[in-house]
């Protein structure tokens, strides 16, 4: 089966920023993404999980986007405008897809 090269972008950000990041991606013509809950992890401040959090933050979410390489800069530019001043991580990896017309 023939595969096609693409980029997988994972953006982990505070849940409170979910709608702003969704809107920014759609405005940048990135319509295909999945949003998953993040239950915990470890970072510069040590281990954390979402239990016992107080306030509006409600933990973290992760966006997963798969795009053609020529769409990557538009996605990153839109995402960075939202992510740059907040807690978050952006990860980019090479991947392959079966149906290139979907991306």
PLM region descriptions:
Residues 1-103:
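Positively charged, small/polar-rich N-terminal and surface patches that mediate targeting and assembly
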């Amino acid at each position: 089966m023939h595969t096609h090269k693409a980029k997988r972008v994972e953006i982990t950000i505070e849940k409170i920023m979910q709608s702003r990041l969704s809107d920014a991606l759609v405005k940048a013509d990135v319509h295909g993404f999945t949003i998953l809950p993040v239950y915990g992890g470890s970072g510069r401040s040590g281990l954390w999980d979402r239990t016992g959090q107080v306030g509006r933050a409600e933990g973290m979410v992760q966006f997963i986007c798969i795009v053609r390489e020529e769409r990557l800069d538009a996605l990153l530019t839109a995402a960075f405008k939202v992510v740059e001043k907040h807690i978050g991580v952006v990860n980019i990896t090479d991947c392959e897809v079966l149906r290139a017309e979907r991306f």
